[in-house]
Amino acid sequence: MDIAALLSGGVDSSVVVHLLCEQGYKPTLFYIKIGMDGAEYMDCSAEEDIELSTAIARRYGLALEVVDLHREYWDNVAAYAIEKIRKGQTPNPDVMCNKLIKFGCFEQQVGKDFDLTATGHYATTLQLGGKTWLGTAKDPIKDQTDFLAQIDYLQVSKLLFPIGGLMKHEVREIALQAGLPSARRKDSQGICFLGKINYNDFVRRFLGEKEGAVIEFETGKKIGTHRGYWFHTIGQRKGLGLGGGPWFVVKKDIQDNIIYVSHGYDAEQQYGYEFRMKDFNFITDNPWEGSTGEEEVTFKIRHTPEFIKGRLLHDEEGYRIISSEKLQGIAPGQFGVIYDAESRVCFGSGEIG
């Protein structure tokens, strides 16, 4: 069986290679090079990533190829993020990177020549009813199915997640015992295309600055200023520069460039119990095809370890979730990710409208 393995230079993908080789496979290794447009935005950490990936390839006597998808990434993912921010929405570039780049452009250019593509994502695949479904990882804190919930059936049916059945500390221990060069490397943080670039610097480059008012939601009183609504997201608590907190963003007026904040006077105004999703993507199948009732599900609206219980309803306008608990920071542009009631199978996701 011919397997393509995606390397990032981190401990997770390195352990993927180690496990595949222990099982007798000889995967071909690929490092996908992405990044911002413009030399001043190129991330120097990519050089270290490639060095570590090269060391892994040499360690196991495997071929490593660097696949440059910088232009494809810029056209498909970075541009998407900028447009969402411009509209006052909260983008999720990691979701689109998986859908369009790692399992999109890479598959079209390279992966098509292999039987399977292995990655270091914390996820699993399940065989149910003769079909492949996206399953959650053993480690709920590291589970990354929410970042994979926009892929399609052709993509999930070719994916292999060798570390999905392991806890993070087990992965780290395997790397230490095997003496892998990335064994003690810290996990990457933040948006995938920014690398070490400051998020606000990225936004400022493309959207500039424009002073606007910060208004207390409950009283209508102006309590400060900001440099542009596009620097702020619903639910944001840090970086507001306001005294007397904690404050968090509860609303944005895009037309008048106003940020509304609150810190707990009226909890019912700050939270919601339901949200709608548009253009819902079922990864494998719609398990409720033809059903007109409510379905018991679990879901996520951001990358957190917790799965929230709720009810999924379908009407002429699409799908909506009624949560069993209050939800803070329901952000248009993010994705509502739907799972079965046991949080075992990830069915797909839709953009929160």
Swiss-Prot record:
- One Pfam family assigned to this protein is tRNA_Me_trans_M
Listed disulfide bonds for this chain? C97-C192
Instruction: Spell out the catalytic residues.
Output: C97 (nucleophile), C192 (cysteine persulfide intermediate)
Annotated ATP binding lies at L6, L7, S8, G9, G10, V11, D12, S13, G120
An example Gene Ontology cellular component term from the record?
cytoplasm
Species whose genome carries this gene: Bacteroides fragilis (strain ATCC 25285 / DSM 2151 / CCUG 4856 / JCM 11019 / LMG 10263 / NCTC 9343 / Onslow / VPI 2553 / EN-2)
Q: Which protein is depicted?
A: tRNA-specific 2-thiouridylase MnmA 2
Q: Where is this region: Interaction with tRNA?
A: 142-144
